[in-house]
């Protein structure tokens, strides 16, 4: 992009970007030093406006449909050119960054943004390398033009905004969107497409490591506890959202964290609380008259966020990498109150529950979502971000688990004693105690009871957890009603799973309707 008519700031520092954002009226400074920015009507991702260019080099490997919508190559060229022309006389911010903290599996990316705060977000969430693109790989380009207005009749979009990935040209176009999470999830989708061809499993998970080098992964949708549970004062954080699992180890795809802020408290989430300071971007967080953030205020959205670099976390793995995981945790948020707080899975059950991705949308990250909590099945615990057919990722997971001998657990961070509205949600200290027992290895060979309808093995005891909580039927006053809800959930699993072509061993590993 030419910088004759416009001013272009290359690789600007955090302080410069905060200054630019304030001078340009893009945000305000909070009492804790963070920058607050508002994203307008779109306070979450816009899945209906996400497209992938349908071109010969990648078309056969993508699962086309409502998640991966096809976009014509010619329409993309025209729209890219119009956005470039729109930005030609604008002040711009450009950084050379990387996605993937692995010397073999990184992707270099040049990020061009119209807004200073979007550039700060990109520099917080992507990796700022000591030496850019050491292997001289072809460079991806992201252009983010939030003030460009798409015209569906002219541009081939579904609305006034679009997110479009082009694998052949290594381009990502974001137009008409202020919500910054689209940038990180776009490059996550890119890596989710590229990594399997290199024998690497891309994962929507968080990861941390103990003092002895033992790695734990936490899979889950937004709001189920990935960030909270991986930010453990007793362990070292690798990352909170996106990772690759290669033979020999796991690596963070990012260089920062994107934590949910709703109801954030210093007591329950000290690591996240302390990370919010100068350089952090707060999205759609409301402040009082003294500029103190009010994390309880959801008047703009339930999906309030903090974007900060990993350097803001004291206890972290500085190379953003770890050994292969001894423990893998699938976080599910069960709104029916039926699932136990922890189950120990066989490798076939792991494949079944990975493909099912049963959970709930909690303070959903997608626009148009209400604050109502709905159950959902999200393949691989992140269906919106995986371009290839689900079986590709499930096979890679099975391969890695078998090869290393990882133990997989299903942990319910949702409700017990009744469905949402009647029962109560498991509190964070209870879930932390369960996770402590998992990472210490105490549950790997624990004595279990079998729940027939759910087809799950549940430990009879977990240190620090009320034994009555472990078998969910004990927490329901009406046992017959529990059995009815359990049967309904088993039927929902079976109905959802019918679409998958898998072995009988995997199909039979699910609940028994």
Swiss-Prot record:
Q: Where does substrate bind?
A: 45, 179, 185, 305
Alphabetized PROSITE patterns for the sequence: PEPCK_ATP (PS00532)
Q: What is the protein's major site of localization?
A: cytoplasm
> Where does the secretion signal sit in this chain?
none
**Which Gene Ontology terms describe the biological processes this protein takes part in?**
gluconeogenesis
Q: Which UniProt keywords apply?
A: ATP-binding, Cytoplasm, Decarboxylase, Gluconeogenesis, Lyase, Manganese, Metal-binding, Nucleotide-binding
Q: Record's CDD domains?
A: PEPCK_ATP
Its EC number is 4.1.1.49
| Places the protein is found | Cytoplasm
Give residues annotated as binding Mn(2+).
185, 204, 241
Kindly tell me the pathway this chain contributes to.
Carbohydrate biosynthesis; gluconeogenesis
List required co-factors.
Mn(2+)
GO cellular-component terms in the record? cytosol
Is the Lyase keyword given for this protein?
A: yes
Q: Which domain of life is it from?
A: Bacteria
Could you tell me which Pfam families the record lists for this protein?
PEPCK_ATP
**Cofactor binding summary note:** Binds 1 Mn(2+) ion per subunit.
- Family designation: Belongs to the phosphoenolpyruvate carboxykinase (ATP) family.
**Briefly, what is this protein's role?**
Involved in the gluconeogenesis. Catalyzes the conversion of oxaloacetate (OAA) to phosphoenolpyruvate (PEP) through direct phosphoryl transfer between the nucleoside triphosphate and OAA.
| Family annotation (NCBIfam families) | pckA, PRK09344.1-2, PRK09344.1-3, PRK09344.1-5
Descriptive protein name: Phosphoenolpyruvate carboxykinase (ATP)
Q: What is the gene called? A: pckA
């Amino acid at each position: 992009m030419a910088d004759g008519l416009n001013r272009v700031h290359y690789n600007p520092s955090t302080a410069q970007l905060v200054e630019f954002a304030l001078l340009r009226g893009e945000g305000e400074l909070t009492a804790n030093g963070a920058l607050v920015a508002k994203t307008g009507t779109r306070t979450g991702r816009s899945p209906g406006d996400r497209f992938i260019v349908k071109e010969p080099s990648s078309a056969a490997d993508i699962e086309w449909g409502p998640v991966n919508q096809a976009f014509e190559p010619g329409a993309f060229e025209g729209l890219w050119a119009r956005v470039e022309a729109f930005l030609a006389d604008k002040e711009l911010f450009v950084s050379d960054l990387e996605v993937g903290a692995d010397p073999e599996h990184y992707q270099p990316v040049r990020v061009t943004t119209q807004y200073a705060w979007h550039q700060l977000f990109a520099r917080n969430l992507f990796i700022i390398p000591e030496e850019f693109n050491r292997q001289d790989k072809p460079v991806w380009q992201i252009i983010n033009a939030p003030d460009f207005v798409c015209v569906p009749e002219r541009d081939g979009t579904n609305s006034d905004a679009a997110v479009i990935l082009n694998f052949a040209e290594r381009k990502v176009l974001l137009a008409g969107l202020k919500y910054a999470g689209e940038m990180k999830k776009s490059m996550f989708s890119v890596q989710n497409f590229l990594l399997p061809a290199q024998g690497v499993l891309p994962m929507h998970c968080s990861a941390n490591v103990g003092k002895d080098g033992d790695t734990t992964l936490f899979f889950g949708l937004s709001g189920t506890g990935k960030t909270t549970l991986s930010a453990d004062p007793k362990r070292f954080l690798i990352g909170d959202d996106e990772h690759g699992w290669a033979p020999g180890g796991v690596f963070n795809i990012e260089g920062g964290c994107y934590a949910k802020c709703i109801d954030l408290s210093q007591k329950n989430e000290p690591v996240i609380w302390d990370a919010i300071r100068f350089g952090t971007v707060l999205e759609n967080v409301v402040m009082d008259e003294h500029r103190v953030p009010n994390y309880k205020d959801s008047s703009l959205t339930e999906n309030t966020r903090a974007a900060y670099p990993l350097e803001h976390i004291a206890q972290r793995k500085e190379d953003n990498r770890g050994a292969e995981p001894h423990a893998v945790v699938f976080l599910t948020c069960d709104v029916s109150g039926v699932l136990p707080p922890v189950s120990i899975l066989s490798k076939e059950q792991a494949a079944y529950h990975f493909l099912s991705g049963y959970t709930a949308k909690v303070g959903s990250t997608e626009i148009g979502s209400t604050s109502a909590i709905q159950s959902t099945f999200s393949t691989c615990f992140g269906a919106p971000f995986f371009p290839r057919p689900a079986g590709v990722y499930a096979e890679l997971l099975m391969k890695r688990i078998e090869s290393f001998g990882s133990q997989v657990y299903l942990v319910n961070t949702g409700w017990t004693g009744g469905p949402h509205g009647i029962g109560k949600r498991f509190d964070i200290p209870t879930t932390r105690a369960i996770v402590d027992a998992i990472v210490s290895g105490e549950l790997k060979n624990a004595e279990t009871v079998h729940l027939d309808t759910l087809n799950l093995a549940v430990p009879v005891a977990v240190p620090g957890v009320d034994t009555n909580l472990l078998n969910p039927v004990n927490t329901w006053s009406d046992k017959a009603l529990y059995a009815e809800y359990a049967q309904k959930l088993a039927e929902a699993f079976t109905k959802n799973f019918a679409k998958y072509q898998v072995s009988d061993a995997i199909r039979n590993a699910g609940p028994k309707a």
